[in-house]
């Protein structure tokens, strides 16, 4: 192999040494220059640490072990489940999911055995991707003593668990289940044996403390870290839950669920076995009030107005800020809104909004997808005086343009809910000019809110009805098609068919909600929908009945208490001959069910429809939906006991709850006014009969006039014996 040509001799070696000395001097100069730059002026002793890569004391080939100090992750590792444990807990999860237990006692025994097997492994299960859902189910179905034991297992680890991807859901569920138990324990006890029963199952350390203390101990573990947890993707959900629990808010309210729920697809409340419900406002111990104020102050401590306003549009921090604002304005009193350290005053510190930064901040939230939700919460709970200031300064002149926007329209709805009758009527006149544009864009939520609030406030809705009629057209059937968006289902948009198909379900839903709101208000708005139904052809009516959104409108129009008898007599015969077809359809079966109620005073129509169901009995019994319709119409009773079915069809009450012919059913006719008068008279006679004869000398005559009594037979027997 050929070698590289190298110069030999003393001259070549001298040149090589000279070049190496030059390189060494260059490196030393560079090192000295870097060291000088890193010294702090005015203090020669204080130096900034020199990076490893700029120090050559160990030679050019030196590579340090830790060139860059990585952030230290202090999250503890609780271990992993082995394969046998994972298989066991996966089977337990499937068993609870199927819920095929014979009774509640068997299910509780199974839960106890699973919890016993999970002893000492609770933290592993909570942090496991495959088994954390089992822990959520176990928490939902555990008793109070078992929940206290779980609090004991989680104690000392809440700060790390609430930040874990899977364990955070278990913490949420644990706090949600603890809320009704706190309410139950805060009530005065009447039985001394209640505590003894709870302490039987759990150990002394688990059940000795009340649930309120366990919740407060968990909150104390999170103190000092609120600023970081506020924007942590998993811990923020737990913070919202804790705020609602401390405030005693309803945990089943839809508005609260929207800002709390981590997963919409699962409903673990279905597994609850305790009798205490979390619905409605809950009573909480007084110590929760102090803990709530301390938690709110800790969450916003050190946060200035600029940071809070930036948090308003933060995807994770904004929902926490919404709960903070709602709890502060509703639970801590109206005086809290005047406190300069409150969340409201730190967001909007100005008393006047004209040409201020607060006005700019509010204007920017109207069109932000995240910030608009905070603005909804603000308008919903802010005191009346503060609301009027914002409305007059910012909203009143822009209500029309806000109603047109897809995002700002939801804020406009919250504004309409707070307006008085006079302000609502003036606002309606402004919005009416934008109705054609809103109808064209299918932005109907503001129109629906106008109808609902106008009915509540007693406003004149005739101008709105005329505007809607001109916007949708004068032809009745075409108008209904445009409202329900049924004609666009088969004709996608030529410009962007993908976008049209994506937005169509949402547009159909909003159109259905608008039509239902119009039917609930008697007058020209309801007549617009009813006249369209009467002029519609039978095939079009069947299409509406089979539509998931259109069938809701049809059901609303057939409700007995709202629909007139003339309308029901005209539209119900159109369904004759198509009842079996509707009964076998998912949406149409609900229309058939509502026909039973709609024909309460139209017995001849109800019998005609029942005969049609009998003629299609086999097809109905072979279908799940058909069997439900058959049961709701009491068709077994119709075939075997026609008289009792007629009594039920007329709206008469039956003692039996089902229409099974094997049960002995008794028909109780509604009492007429004459029967009620007779009962009152008989009650008066009995009262007078109980009084002494000295007080009521005419009692005997009134008793004889009222009704015959058994003592008369006894007096006859005494006469015979005499």
From Swiss-Prot:
Classification via InterPro entries: ARM-like, ARM-type_fold, NOP9, Pumilio_RNA-bd_rpt
Gene Ontology process terms (BP): endonucleolytic cleavage in 5'-ETS of tricistronic rRNA transcript (SSU-rRNA, 5.8S rRNA, LSU-rRNA); endonucleolytic cleavage in ITS1 to separate SSU-rRNA from 5.8S rRNA and LSU-rRNA from tricistronic rRNA transcript (SSU-rRNA, 5.8S rRNA, LSU-rRNA); endonucleolytic cleavage to generate mature 5'-end of SSU-rRNA from (SSU-rRNA, 5.8S rRNA, LSU-rRNA); ribosomal small subunit export from nucleus
Basic and acidic residues bias: start-end ranges: 11-20, 27-42, 684-705
Cellular component, GO, one term: nucleolus
Pumilio repeats: 113-152, 153-188, 303-339, 357-392, 393-429, 535-573, 574-611
Biased composition (Low complexity): 712-722
Keywords: Nucleus, Repeat, Ribosome biogenesis, rRNA processing
Domain of life of the source: Eukaryota
Region feature Disordered, mapped onto this chain: 1-54, 187-207, 684-722
Molecular function (Gene Ontology), one example: RNA binding
One Pfam family hit: PUF_NOP9
Ranges annotated as biased composition (Basic residues): 1-10
Major place of residence: nucleus
Subcellular compartments: Nucleus, Nucleolus
Disulphide linkage map: none
Protein family: Belongs to the NOP9 family.
Described purpose of this protein according to its UniProt entry: RNA-binding nucleolar protein required for pre-rRNA processing. Involved in production of 18S rRNA and assembly of small ribosomal subunit.
Protein name: Nucleolar protein 9
Organism from which the protein derives: Coccidioides posadasii (strain C735)
């Amino acid at each position: 192999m050929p070698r590289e040509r190298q110069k030999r001799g003393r001259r070549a070696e001298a040149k090589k040494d000279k070049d190496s000395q030059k390189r060494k001097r260059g490196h030393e100069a560079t090192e000295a220059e870097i060291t000088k730059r890193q010294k702090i002026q005015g203090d020669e002793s204080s130096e900034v640490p020199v990076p490893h890569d700029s120090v050559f004391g160990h030679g050019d080939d030196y590579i340090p072990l830790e060139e860059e100090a990585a952030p230290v992750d202090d999250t503890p590792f609780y271990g992993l489940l082995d394969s046998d444990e994972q298989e066991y807990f996966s089977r337990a999860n499937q068993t609870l999911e199927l819920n095929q237990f014979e009774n509640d006692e068997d299910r509780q025994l199974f839960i106890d055995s699973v919890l016993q097997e999970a002893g000492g492994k609770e933290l592993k299960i909570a942090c496991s991707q495959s088994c954390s859902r089992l822990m959520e189910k176990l928490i939902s179905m555990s008793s109070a003593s078992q929940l206290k034991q779980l609090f004991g297992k989680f104690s000392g680890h809440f700060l790390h668990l609430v930040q874990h991807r899977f364990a955070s859901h278990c913490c949420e569920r644990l706090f949600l289940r603890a809320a009704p138990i706190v309410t139950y324990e805060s009530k005065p006890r009447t039985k001394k044996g209640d505590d003894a029963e709870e302490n039987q199952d759990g150990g002394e350390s688990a059940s000795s403390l009340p649930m309120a203390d366990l919740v407060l101990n968990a909150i104390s573990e999170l103190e000092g870290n609120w600023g970081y947890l506020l924007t942590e993707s998993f811990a923020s959900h737990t913070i919202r839950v804790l705020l609602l629990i401390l405030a005693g808010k309803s945990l089943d309210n839809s508005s609260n669920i929207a800002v709390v729920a981590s997963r919409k697809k699962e409903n673990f409340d279905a597994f609850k076995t305790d009798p205490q419900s979390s619905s409605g406002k809950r009573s909480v111990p007084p110590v929760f009030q102090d803990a709530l104020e301390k938690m709110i102050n800790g969450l916003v401590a050190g946060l200035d107005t600029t940071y809070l306003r930036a948090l308003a549009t933060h995807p994770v921090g904004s929902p926490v800020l919404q709960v903070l604002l709602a709890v502060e304005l509703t639970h801590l009193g109206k005086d809290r809104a005047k406190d300069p350290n409150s969340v409201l005053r730190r967001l909007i510190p100005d008393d006047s909004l004209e040409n201020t930064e607060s006005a700019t901040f509010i204007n920017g939230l109207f069109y932000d997808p995240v910030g608009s939700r905070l603005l909804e919460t603000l308008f919903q709970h802010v005191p009346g005086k503060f609301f009027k200031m914002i409305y007059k300064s910012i909203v009143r002149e822009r209500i029309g343009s806000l109603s047109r926007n897809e995002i700002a329209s939801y804020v406009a709805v919250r504004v309409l809910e707070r307006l008085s009758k006079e302000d609502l009527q003036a606002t309606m006149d402004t919005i009416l000019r934008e109705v054609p544009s809103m109808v064209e864009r299918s932005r109907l939520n503001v129109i629906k809110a106008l109808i609902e609030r106008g009915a509540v406030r007693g406003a004149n809705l005739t101008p709105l009805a005329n505007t809607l009629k001109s916007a949708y057209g004068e032809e009745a059937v075409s108008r209904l098609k445009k409202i329900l968006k049924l004609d666009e289902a088969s004709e996608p948009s030529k410009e962007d068919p993908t976008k049209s198909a994506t937005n169509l379900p949402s547009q159909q839903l909003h159109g259905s909600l608008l039509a239902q709101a119009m039917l609930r208000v008697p007058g020209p708005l309801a007549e617009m929908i009813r006249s369209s139904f009467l002029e519609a052809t039978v095939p079009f009516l069947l299409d509406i009945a089979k539509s998931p959104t259109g069938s809701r409108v049809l059901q609303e129009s057939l409700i007995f208490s709202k629909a007139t008898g003339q309308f029901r007599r005209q539209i119900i015969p159109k369904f004759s001959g198509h009842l079996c077809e509707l009964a076998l359809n998912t949406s149409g079966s609900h229309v058939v069910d509502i026909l039973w109620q709609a024909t309460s005073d139209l017995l001849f129509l109800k019998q005609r429809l029942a005969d049609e169901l009998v003629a299609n009995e086999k097809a109905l019994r072979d279908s799940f939906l058909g069997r439900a319709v058959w049961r709701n119409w009491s068709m077994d009773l119709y075939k075997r006991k026609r008289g009792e079915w007629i009594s039920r069809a007329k709206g008469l009450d039956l003692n039996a709850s089902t229409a099974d012919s094997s049960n002995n059913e008794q028909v109780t006719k509604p009492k007429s006014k004459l029967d009620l008068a007779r009962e009152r008279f008989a009650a008066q006679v009995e009262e007078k009969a109980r009084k002494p004869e000295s007080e009521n000398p005419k009692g005997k005559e009134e008793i004889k006039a009222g009704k015959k009594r058994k003592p008369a037979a006894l007096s006859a027997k005494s006469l015979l014996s005499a």
